[in-house]
């Protein structure tokens, strides 16, 4: 159904792409969500968050590369969005780049509980304890 809709509709909006990407991710089809992402010229916050979620679902080195490239191109204003940061941390941790995730986490001024959870993914126990200790002292 999603594929039929995406091929028949002439002009797609960001909302359309977002709904389709969310559907693909929810139905365990992250590669299709990423394929859609490549078709979008100017993604908004929601689209970028979905591509990070798709990358986290894959957990591959290719997904890590896409996460980093998207992060580089992402407007700096998006860095203050805790939902996007949580998705970035989830993707980085799931794809295995703990150091980069830690640097983003440590530079964030507004740490949220979901961000703590994302940092726990794939992180050795000792690093989790350090994160909790840092959080309690800040």
For every predicted segment, state its role.
Residues 1-138:
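Alpha-helical tandem repeat RNA-binding modules
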């Amino acid at each position: 159904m999603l594929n039929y809709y995406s091929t028949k509709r002439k002009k797609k909006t960001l909302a359309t792409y977002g709904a389709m990407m969310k559907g693909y991710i929810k139905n365990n089809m992250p590669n299709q969500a990423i394929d859609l992402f490549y078709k979008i010229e100017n993604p908004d916050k929601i689209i970028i968050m979905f591509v990070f979620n798709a990358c986290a679902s894959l957990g591959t080195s290719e997904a890590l590369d896409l996460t980093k490239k998207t992060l580089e191109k992402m407007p700096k204003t998006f860095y203050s969005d805790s939902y996007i940061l949580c998705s970035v941390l989830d993707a980085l941790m799931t794809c295995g780049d703990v150091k980069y995730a830690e640097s983003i986490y440590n530079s964030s001024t507004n740490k949220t509980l979901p961000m703590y959870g994302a940092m726990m993914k794939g992180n050795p126990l000792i690093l989790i304890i350090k994160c909790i200790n840092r959080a309690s002292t800040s």
